[in-house]
From Swiss-Prot:
Active site as annotated: 225 (proton acceptor)
Protein name: UDP-3-O-acylglucosamine N-acyltransferase
Key words of the record: Acyltransferase, Lipid A biosynthesis, Lipid biosynthesis, Lipid metabolism, Repeat, Transferase
Protein's organism: Paracidovorax citrulli (strain AAC00-1)
Reactions catalysed according to its record: a UDP-3-O-[(3R)-3-hydroxyacyl]-alpha-D-glucosamine + a (3R)-hydroxyacyl-[ACP] = a UDP-2-N,3-O-bis[(3R)-3-hydroxyacyl]-alpha-D-glucosamine + holo-[ACP] + H(+)
InterPro entries referenced in this protein's UniProt entry, alphabetically: Hexapep, Hexapep_transf_CS, LpxD, Trimer_LpxA-like_sf, UDP_GlcNAc_AcTrfase_non-rep
PROSITE patterns found in the cross-reference section: HEXAPEP_TRANSFERASES (PS00101)
Superkingdom of origin organism: Bacteria
Subunit structure: Homotrimer.
One example of a Gene Ontology biological process annotation: lipid A biosynthetic process
EC number: 2.3.1.191
GO MF annotation, one: N-acyltransferase activity
Keyword check for Lipid metabolism: yes
Amino acid sequence: MSVRLRQIVEALGGTIEGGGGDVEILRIAPLESAEPGDLAFLSNPRYRQQLAASRAACVIVAPAMREEALARGACIVAEDPYAYFARATQLWKRLHGRTPAAGVHPSAVVDPDAFVDPSAHIGPLCVVERGARIGAGTVLTSRITVGEGCRIGERCLLHPGVVIGADGFGFAAEGGAWTKIEQLGAVRIGDDVEIGANTCIDRGALDDTVIEDGVKLDNLVQIGHNVHIGRHTAVAGCTGVSGSTRIGARCMIGGAAMILGHLEIADGVQVSPGTAITRSVLKPGLYSGMFPFDENAKWEKNAATLRQLHGLRARIMALEEQIRKDGPTAHIQ
């Protein structure tokens, strides 16, 4: 099914340049591999060479790239091409009827004491336990568990295998063994949240674990009990957040990051992939803590040197102290 450029611009705004609104779009494609009939986008001027070579029927560009885009053919001029592309994908999905229909799949299990909004979609093999609430327009794709008393807001999207409200990891050491701390809280998820496949969000021990509006969690993310994640924060795959940590709004957490428990992360913090956050971060900015990879032989030498840093530091401090006592010229031959 094709879509005319005019339909896209009428729905999303922007301006068509260098071509008529009757140009037919067959699909949305990457700039470098687009074919005639495709709609592509360019958000980074570094890739302008791909623009000149692209065979796309139309390219979404910023005003600064308008002239270069017109030199090759039709374009849609938008202030933020990447955001425009994102909204174009949503429009494409709506027009092609890929939005899940409201209702509960016959294989899903919904407790009689749970509430599911009539406009929500509960997919195959999902389980919604007692007292849980699923908001309007929310989609549970398949094999998802929403635990007792947990609440999910409106227009959320949960991908296969998500578990909401399993017990948090809480045990007390007693007599050489572990005594379980019953997890008496729940999970509260706001509106417009997306949760990737096989991500787990544990219920709180006493208070609830909270995921605020607009949060995006990638696949295989572990959120511990009593964590609080602020609005519009994005967390990439394989990240673990330990219990009772508070992450602010509009943060970006890179893949495979590790965040210890009982920490405070300010609004607007960015964490590089693979970074271990071991103390609170109280100022916005980009934080990194990775040991660079190298050829193994070089890495082993660097690692051996790293183990000696404390001793080397002590020796340097002793030398500096000796120079301070003797004067800066005493050791010059």
